[in-house]
Amino acid sequence: MANQLQVPKQKLAKPPLAIHTLGDRVLRQGSKQISGINDEVRKLAQQMLQTMYSADGIGLAAPQVGVNKRMIVVDIDPENAARPPLVLINPLIKQFSSDLAVDQEGCLSVPSIYADVRRPERVVATYRDLNGRPVTLEATGLLARCIQHEIDHLDGVLFVDRVENQIALAPQLVEKGFAVRDVQVRA
């Protein structure tokens, strides 16, 4: 089977998976390694991509859809049909740059909340593709940020945990109906 899934980059009226939000315990669990890549894993990747596109996202981790597995999907250019999305199975960041950048992040699991997060500008990640082959990827800019954000989900970390200005974040969370106590500060 080819590494690339054929998933139209479009919104579905009824996405295949529900996205869990801040406060749901599934988002705080560490995820389990995927031991073998089979049709079930490929189907999950396809459904995650469909769900991500339907929610206007650029990344989604399996725990966000209630699946305790180490898999993320990323597409930082969802408007470009020629650029295929990435499916990273058992991803691991092997190297972080010392150069840090602050940029605004949002999350499908914390809808309508945006805040500045400081992250390394460049990372080197390893993962398995949909054929089980090992891949090493050097990423910069938005792609590096997105990969770090999604891998955080695999370890039970949400972007709101990394926000340095928690005082400014708290009123936003309350306004959108989230409990401030659900944030686990790691900034």
Curated annotation (Swiss-Prot):
One of its GO terms (molecular function) is metal ion binding. Its cofactor is Fe(2+). The active site is at E150. Its EC number is 3.5.1.88. It holds the Pfam family Pep_deformylase. It catalyses: N-terminal N-formyl-L-methionyl-[peptide] + H2O = N-terminal L-methionyl-[peptide] + formate. Binds 1 Fe(2+) ion. This is Peptide deformylase 2. The gene is def2.
